[in-house]
């Protein structure tokens, strides 16, 4: 795989991760301060994991030749 196509693929993945993060936060916010706040706790964990994944993709992009 050429570095150009790898960069494009990683950029697409980064965009998808950002979109998923926004969607997770939107759902979590609907359950915040409700009796179902345990749902928010789980989704906040998912958000943190997605942020970690986004940073990993960014590091991979920086390491491309």
Which residues make up each language-model segment?
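N-terminal acidic leader/helix
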Residues: 1-28, 58
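Short, solvent-exposed, charged loop/turn and helix-capping segments
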Residues: 2, 63-64
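Short, charge-rich amphipathic interface segments used for partner binding and complex assembly
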Residues: 26-63
